[in-house]
Amino acid sequence: MYAPYATMPDRSRGRAVPEEESSFRSPFQRDRDRIIHASAFRRLKHKTQVFVEHEGDNYRTRLTHSIEVGQVARTIAGALGLNQELTEAVALAHDLGHTPFGHTGEDALHEMMAPYGGFDHNAQAIRIVTALERHYAEFDGLNLTWETLEAIAKHNGPVVGELPWALAACNRGIDLELHTHASAEAQVAALADDIAYNHHDLHDGLRAGLFTDDDVCSLSIIAPAYAEVDEIYPGLDHNRRRHEALRRFFGVMVSDVIETSRRKIAASGAQSVEEIRALDHAVVTFSDEIWTQLRELRAFMFTRMYRAPSVMVVRERVAVVVKALFAYYLENTMAMPERWHGDIRKAETETDRARIVSDYIAGMTDRFALQLYDRLALGA
């Protein structure tokens, strides 16, 4: 049973290319399934967030992260009476536009693309699902519903100011009403992303030895979880103690979003998805108390993990890889795989060519980018 403010599948604004409706899947189920079967989604298996792929099999990748975000998003959406299929579709698609090597790769590609409009991973996700996936006979992209496109574009809130070129190109053909908030389903996907990375980055950092359990017990949002585990399970072995504490931390975040969002939605008086979009604030959020504690956690993680010396050494190296690949292919565009040659022949300006090169590099996995860099002897 949907809440009145949920996105109703039978009221979808449809797809850019009209299609016959399925007799057994909702429009948003079809969107989710198309995302799962997209080649860009499969490539997330070999794209990392903090640790480069070869550093260990137990660290999260973009794919495992996206699956975790989807699970959290469905849970929260169900508790709030929202459309779980739409929420999950957005959650699974939110990282499609990421480059190899996480935000380091994105920063390097954005630097190289600065003369040509820059690079933005959220806009690239839209570009992938509207243009770059080329498997269907009747359209490029995945031909997703308006609601799913809107949610991918605006899951972090209204898009104001100058638009990234890839998003502007899409919006010229499909007005996504970028100045408004997105549906509550999109807002849930954004918070689920926060919850998932807060949890798994902490776990991965502990596993990597960048900090200890005692270190994280200094954090106000983590300490109660360890204290509760120690009280209930005295003498528990190290790994089980950590797992039990982190799952409690995870549960605190999920419960807080559900309880806080219920109150905010009720206070807003919204009775439709249109009224959710028309509000001047998001309705799916953490409480002020948890936000404060999470800011403390993020400051800790920034210092101890994201800017740890061992991580920074690798980041500097992979940034060189991305920049070298971009420079090489901008000078040698026809050296790109044959599937790109049609686009290259249509390119009229250097900006057009640079954006094609950007598409190619952004789609690479960590492993492929490193192997290609070595094969081309770009570090010689």
UniProtKB/Swiss-Prot annotation:
InterPro entries: dGTPase (IPR006261), Diverse_Catalytic_Enzymes (IPR051094), dNTPase_2 (IPR023023), HD/PDEase_dom (IPR003607), HD_domain (IPR006674), PHydrolase_assoc_dom (IPR026875). Pfam families: HD (PF01966), HD_assoc (PF13286). Signal peptide: none annotated. Transmembrane segments: none annotated. Residues 62-198 form the HD domain. It comes from the Bacteria. One of its GO terms (molecular function) is triphosphoric monoester hydrolase activity. Keywords: Hydrolase. Residues 1-28 are annotated as: Disordered. This is Deoxyguanosinetriphosphate triphosphohydrolase-like protein. It comes from Ruegeria sp. (strain TM1040).
